[in-house]
Design a protein with these regions (language model features):
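Conserved short alpha-helical segments that host acidic/polar catalytic motifs at enzyme active sites
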Residues: 2-211
């Protein structure tokens, strides 16, 4: 086999090895219409999804019958059984919630980058758990920074959360705000978004990421 032939063979082999979808992070969302607490259910859901990410995990919940705008969250570095104790789960009262297990593809592996992200903004509170990557992160980050956004993390999930929060100021519902934000974010992703009263799931237009 000639040198050129070997190079072609190596390139072909490399292509075959990498020509697969690489899916990282696990997202979970639940809304119990009967009003039951969901933290433990989310925990076991994350436990089942833990093969998708072992760096960090977190849960955010809200009680739809409780004070409007209250979202409780707990997250940390490590596996589910390292981050959550039975007492932690018991203290998280709420019948709507989202959860996340992280495998970092963008941003460093730190507690600040653990999800779900919870934002307080003029319209209330927003929780977000996201899997995937955006391809226009630098442009969106610069656009948000020009309007005064202060970033607490290095992950593109925060950009999505900011885009939704900013859209919500002009849109009548959280659902409409998510749809509006999705017009501007580009990439392969899936996400679950919660307000204190609503739970929304979304995927990129091509449905690359599982949900």
């Amino acid at each position: 086999v000639t040198t050129t032939g070997r190079k072609r063979q190596m390139i072909h082999q490399q292509y075959e090895v990498d020509d697969h979808l690489h899916e990282e992070c696990g997202v979970f969302g639940i809304y119990d219409m009967d009003g039951n607490d969901v933290a433990s259910t989310i925990y076991y859901g994350l436990f089942a999804l833990q093969h998708r990410g072992q760096e960090s995990c977190g849960i955010a919940v809200s009680d739809t019958s409780g004070p409007k705008g209250l979202v409780l969250s707990h997250k940390g570095m490590g596996l589910c059984n390292e981050v959550f104790t039975p007492e932690d789960l018991e203290s998280m009262k709420g019948n709507i919630g989202v959860g996340h297990t992280r495998y970092s593809t963008a941003g460093s592996s730190t507690r600040e980058n653990a999800q779900p992200l919870v934002l307080n903004y003029i319209k209330g509170t927003l929780g977000l758990a996201h899997n995937g990557n955006l391809i226009n992160t630098p442009q969106l980050r610069q656009e948000l920074a020009r309007t005064g956004a202060i970033f607490q993390t290095t992950i593109d999930s925060e950009i999505i959360a900011y885009m939704i929060a900013r859209a919500r100021v002009e849109q009548p519902t959280v659902q409409a705000a998510v749809a509006e934000a999705m017009k501007k974010i580009k990439g392969a992703y899936s996400l679950v978004v919660m307000s204190p009263r609503k739970l929304i799931g979304a995927r990129d237009p091509y449905g690359f990421r599982p949900l």
